[in-house]
Design a protein with these regions (language model features):
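Residue-level detection of the helix-turn-helix DNA-binding "recognition helix"
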Residues: 13, 27, 38, 66
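A short, Lys/Arg-rich alpha-helix, primarily the initiator
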Residues: 1-20
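Short C-terminal boundary/hinge segments that cap the last helix of small helical domains
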Residues: 55-67
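Recognition helix of helix-turn-helix/homeodomain-like DNA-binding domains
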Residues: 28-42
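Residues in the helix-turn-helix
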Residues: 32, 46, 60
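Short, basic-rich loop-to-helix N-cap that marks the start of a DNA-contacting helix
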Residues: 39-52
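The alpha-helix within a helix-turn-helix
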Residues: 12, 23, 51
Length: 67
């Protein structure tokens, strides 16, 4: 199964935030954001930190695509 984070990138644009701003606000590493940019998997802890920082749910930042 593949994970798509297009919703997250759109949300950042809507909030006028850069990826480095997300890292700082959520307390996550730039490596995690890079992984997400490449469609890689990150821990649920990272996703939870992003959701808390952006005041959203996981459905708002990601989508699981069937193989």
């Amino acid at each position: 199964m593949a994970v798509c984070y297009k919703k997250l990138w759109k949300l950042l644009i809507d909030k006028d935030m850069k990826k480095k701003d997300l890292c700082a606000k959520a307390g996550i590493s730039s490596a995690s954001v890079t992984k997400m940019g490449k469609g890689g998997h990150v821990t649920t802890e990272v996703l939870a930190k992003i959701c808390t920082a952006l005041d959203c749910t996981m459905d708002d930042i990601m989508e699981i695509l069937p193989d």
